[in-house]
Amino acid sequence: MYSISFQEDSLLPRERLAKEGVEALSNQELLAILLRTGTRQVSVFEIAQKVLNNLSSLTDLKKMTLQELQSLSGIGRVKAIELQAMIELGHRIHKHETLEMESILSSQKLAKKMQQELGDKKQEHLVALYLNTQNQIIHQQTIFIGSVTRSIAEPREILHYAIKHMATSLILVHNHPSGAVAPSQNDDHVTKLVKEACELMGIVLLDHLIVSHSNYFSYREKTDLI
């Protein structure tokens, strides 16, 4: 009798990622996926944990040289190179996002960006942008697609994502498929309702933009509601 064995230590976290989403995975599981396999003596989970144990924080991983990565048990030259490449790619993505976020802080620049995203939509889309203390956009969430009246009594969903992402302020954006960006009474009501809800939670409503393909309206610029 004989048996064939093979090591697919990172298979379980891969399955969890596919079923539950990447945010459900621990740092150890994410690192195990990147490392893929362990050695005959050490599982990929043990290697991942040893790497994490050598760090005071995840940012230390970016600071490690190729040689320092290779000095860790179970990580050879190829894995060290792959890790560095993945870390650098993540860093560049974050850097690009930060630069983009910093460049759209004015209502005009943000409106132009959102016009490109929502201006040609045939249905109304309500989008919330969540910002940190540096006024950088840390998350963008489509709250709903359809009629704005649907959300009038339910600012809770908007605030749910603000709390989830620890945002200190937010910006609402929705489109008018008709092309006219003048706010309706309903738009005014939604703005007041969300602002009041934000104030109760200590969150600042920075603006509410209405966009079309070629124009925009800013509550902060044009009204005293914000």
Curated annotation (Swiss-Prot):
Pfam family, one: UPF0758_N
Keyword Nucleotidyltransferase listed: no
GO MF annotation list: metal ion binding; metallopeptidase activity
Binding site for Zn(2+): H174, H176, D187
Listed GO biological process terms: proteolysis
Motif JAMM motif mapped to chain: 174-187
All residue ranges annotated as the MPN domain in the record: 103-225
Keywords on record: Hydrolase, Metal-binding, Metalloprotease, Protease, Zinc
InterPro entries given in the database record: MPN, RadC_JAB, RuvA_2-like, UPF0758, UPF0758_CS, UPF0758_N
Entry keyword Hydrolase: yes
Gene3D superfamilies with a match to the protein in the record: Cytidine Deaminase, domain 2
Family membership: Belongs to the UPF0758 family.
PANTHER family assigned: DNA REPAIR PROTEIN RADC (PTHR30471), UPF0758 PROTEIN YEES-RELATED (PTHR30471:SF3)
Name the record gives this protein: UPF0758 protein SPJ_1027
